[in-house]
A protein has these predicted regions:
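N-terminal Lys/Arg-rich, disordered targeting/topogenic segments
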Residues: 1-6
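Hydrophobic membrane-insertion alpha-helices, especially the h-region
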Residues: 9-26
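Acidic, glycine-enriched catalytic cores built around paired aspartates
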Residues: 29
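Soluble extramembrane regions of membrane proteins in the secretory/endomembrane system
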Residues: 32-341
Length: 341
């Protein structure tokens, strides 16, 4: 190869240009690392909430305890209608028409107009959302309209009781599928952590065919609102991957805010979880990616492990992640009883 380059000056110049071009992203990565000599701990609220239910302490007491130990950031998952339904403390119910009609005397549970919608439904995938407060009704309806293109639904509000009946949309999306659309962070959860002085990091879950421009814009606005230091992707796709405009908006937000792209380790710790488009996103944001050590279930279970009396081996995995694999964030999850692990 050396002899060929000596005989062909043009080829040598091309090779040199190629070498220099390859150094540009490398230098960018090195500079990013030099300005990134710290580690951070981000609390996973979902697992902390499960732990609180298994303990004698309240959520507030646990949140205060972690704050006293220096943990001041929390990842809050955006909720779907089904997530809200599964939370007994939130007065929201979501189900398909088929499920709603399974209970005895179901028609008596709804206003006459709403019951008529359900009776006339010809698609078992049509969905109904029922709220027990007007504020919940408005929050959910506004979220659907902000995040889904050309959202259509029949709505009914009487006093504090609201109903949203969702049928097949213009793009063919079934009502049942829309129950999985992430709507935002439930306001009471936001208030809980703001009251305790935590910095909130919104974490959404993308769904194919529901990850367009409106969804990306709404999620980015949420990141801006909370001034999130990290973008933590989760779900089927990279946020906004379904169109170029959305990816441009995400790139612009990250560059303007200085927020880093959180790259979650795989459970075998060999590589990071990736989505199509994430490499380009890193390229276009100055390689501001930070590696995240995720406490997978098998690590959470290393309590009294390797002869230790307590969680020492879990702590050791934190140290190895930071010192050996250059992880900058510990995604802190709780030690749970096996039935909720």
């Amino acid at each position: 190869m050396k002899s060929i380059l000596k005989r062909n000056r043009v080829l040598a110049v091309i090779a040199l240009i190629g070498l220099l071009a390859s150094l540009v992203p490398l230098i960018s990565r090195v500079q990013a690392e030099k300005s990134n000599k710290y580690y951070d701990i981000v609390l996973d609220y979902n697992s902390m909430r499960s732990m609180a239910r298994q303990s004698s302490q309240s959520e507030d007491e646990w949140i205060d305890l972690f704050k006293s130990l220096g943990v001041d950031k929390v990842a809050l998952s955006e909720a779907s209608a089904l997530n809200l339904h599964d939370n007994a403390a939130i007065p929201v119910y979501a189900m398909t028409v088929k499920k709603a009609a399974e209970s005895y005397g179901w028609e008596d549970q709804y206003p006459a107009e709403v019951a008529q919608w359900l009776r006339e439904s010809t698609d078992v995938s049509d969905a109904i959302i029922w709220t027990e407060t007007a504020a919940s009704y408005e929050w959910i309806l506004n979220a659907f309209e902000a995040r889904f293109e050309d959202f259509e639904a029949k709505t009914y509000l009487e006093g504090e009781h609201g109903f949203i009946f969702i049928q097949q949309q213009k793009n063919g999306m079934k009502g049942e599928k829309l129950l999985d659309l992430r709507l935002g962070i439930w306001p009471d959860t936001v208030e809980l952590f703001e009251r305790h002085g935590y910095q909130i990091i919104p974490r959404s879950v993308t769904e194919k065919n529901m990850n367009g421009t409106k969804f990306a814009k709404a999620y980015i606005e949420e990141l801006k609102h909370f001034n999130a230091p990290y973008f933590m992707n989760n779900g089927d796709e990279l946020v906004g991957y379904e169109d170029d405009e959305s990816l441009e908006l995400l790139t612009q937000y990250l560059n303007e805010s200085g927020a880093s792209v959180a790259m979650m380790e795989q459970n075998d710790q060999s590589q990071n979880l990736v989505w199509p488009g994430v490499e380009e996103l890193l390229d276009n944001t100055g390689y501001r990616g930070v590696r995240v050590f995720n406490e997978w279930a098998y690590i959470q279970n290393r309590y009294q492990y390797c002869g230790y009396e307590g969680p020492e081996e879990i702590t050791n995995t934190f140290f190895r992640a930071i010192a050996e694999r250059n992880c900058k964030i510990i995604f802190l999850k709780m030690i749970l009883e096996p039935d909720t692990d």
